[in-house]
Amino acid sequence: MELGGHRTWYRVDGDLGASARRAPVIICHGGPGATHDYLEPIAELHRSGRACVLYDQLGNGRSDHLPDADPSFWTVELFERELAALAAHLGIDGRYHVIGQSWGGMLALAHALERPPGLLSVVAADSPSSVPGFVAGCNELLDAMDAEVRDTIRAGERSGETSTPEFQAAAMDFYTRHVCRVDPWPDSVVRSFEAMESDPTVYGTMNGPTEFTVVGTIRDFDITDRLPEIEVPVLLVSGEHDEVRPHLVAAMHERLRHGERVLFEDSSHMPHIEEPARFLEVVEGFLERCEA
């Protein structure tokens, strides 16, 4: 698909044909700056007869990379336009769901606020509605880590030296507690992290150096007070050990007019990896209820 002269890569698992009984889903990855790879387990939903669309957002993975783009190019609105354009390009904008993970869920919620007529529901997995709230939560978790890990990360942030082996090891300690607790990480997760490292343009510009210091273009993102404006059903999914703290997700749930919430007790930031069977069951059940 082309948008503004730039190409977005996508793949479809399942049949998008008009005869399909179940509405398709578009699956939005996180980051900003990750790739579709680590969300491939969610596309297993296609085995129930529901087409699943995976894509790499512009600047990432198999889509066009723009390392020389002005920082002002990388905005939430850019990716909102891309998501809407993808639904139209595929001819499914009259009837579809969106599943977003982490940043992808933020994008999905922002998309829902535009009230596209064909959107049936949103699943926001491990997604905050407020970046300042998310950063505060991450720092609370960091403060609870071992002193050596905490001090190494804090020192790296102060100095700007976040690529040293010591910093990377400390960050991985945090990630294995609060991002993905499966050991070892599945290949799909490794591929997404390696892709982010190979071209950090989007993550570095929109987020910043780490989860604990967000200084990029999404630093002020906060749609918490607008959540009551969302008219479609929303399922909020997160993990007990998630870097998106459970109390933040609970506060989001309270504001939604048509919201459901499921907490995965044995998961952190990736219940679709950590508790995959239950995740698929919960999500498919929600999607079916939205189509009943």
What is each of the regions a protein language model found here?
Residues 6-69:
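Conserved HGGG/HGGXW glycine-rich cap/lid loop of the alpha/beta-hydrolase fold
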Residues 94-137:
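Conserved hydrolase catalytic core segment
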Residues 57-103, 281:
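Active-site loop/oxyanion-hole signature of alpha/beta-hydrolase fold enzymes
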Residues 56-61, 128, 267-268:
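Short beta-to-alpha linker loops that shape the active-site pocket of alpha/beta-hydrolase fold enzymes
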Residues 258-292:
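Catalytic active-site module of serine/aspartate enzymes centered on a nucleophile-bearing elbow/loop
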Residues 3-7, 34, 213-221:
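Short gly/ser/thr-rich secondary-structure transition/capping motifs
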